Amino acid sequence: SEMCIRDRDEFVSMGGSYKSHGNCSPVAEYNYWCDPDAAKYVYENLRTKIHMVGLDVTRKIVLTPNILEYMQILDTEKGEFVKNITRFYYDFHWEYERVIGCVINDPLAVAYFLNRELCSGFEAYTTVETEGISIGQSVVDAMNFWKKEENSIVLTEVDEKEFMVMFLHRVFGKSEQEIRTILRQIMA
């Protein structure tokens, strides 16, 4: 419990949002919405800054039909597997956001943990709403109204192409140069 979170040098969280809309309510990101009390507790009690890999950056990581097709060319079995497990998300993102593709949130948090050059942002005090209509919303005090010590690094920018190179290289084992060449053709 308390011991588990206090002894960490670094903490990367795939959750929250700064300026982006929510993905399970108008304002909340799903992970924080599921257990807002836990998210708030961690933000308020961790002794190191939380790297918030929120919807502001994860929404920029879109598995497009072209990338999905490329995955199937790289490895038919793995590509088909990815296609099958993302079908729900393709439908969700089309219905609610009119995006042709699938936002793949979680892999960005892992990639950022491995390579901090992928994302950038700013430090701020962050908390999480635990009640009412905005339950689960991450509240980022970007303008320092509360004059509280910064407890987070809120990520707002991501190098989408470099993420995709890293992701495809790690999952499919192809050379980064080969992947970059193809991605130049299929990523706008």
Language-model regions: role of each:
Residues 2-5:
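Short, small-residue-biased leader/transition segments that mark boundaries at the very start
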Residues 9-10, 49-51:
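Residues at the starts of beta-strands that form the adenosine-phosphate
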Residues 10-41:
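Active-site glycine-rich loop that binds ribose-phosphate moieties when present
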Residues 33, 37, 50-188:
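Conformational coupling and interaction surfaces
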Residues 41-50:
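A structural motif corresponding to the C-terminal end of an alpha-helix
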